[in-house]
Amino acid sequence: MIDIKQGIITLCESEFQITADTTPQALTAAIPALISQVHPVSTGYTHYNCWLDIEPQCYLWASVCFHGDALESIRLFPQHQSATAPAPRPDPMDTESSHLLGHAWYGKFFEQDELSFPRGSIRYVQGRDPIYSPTCVLIRYTSK
């Protein structure tokens, strides 16, 4: 479930809440089995590719990005869904199909293409390329 007024994502099975104050340590402790890959970057960012069960019995592919210990952003890829947390990563999908699936999922929850909350914003991003710039729902967080 996403509480857009507060910018909180509550996972269904674990009931773990991802907030602007979530740290990498808290994420890895709460959902270790759902994290498929961790990519540290030389600029201080670390990307956690994982499956998040935002809806009951529906896992979405996501990339959770931290800069140091600060949560920077979450990219949700609703075009990649599964009833169980499946393989290490989803297969690429053509741009048009991913746009249609992503926009339909976003429209179920949000009425506007961009919304803000006290410490960030959420918006729908129509992708241009299935690998380097895929369709996603982008949640950005700001520091205190």
Region spans (language model):
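Short helix/turn-capping signatures at newly exposed starts of structured segments
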Residues: M1-K144
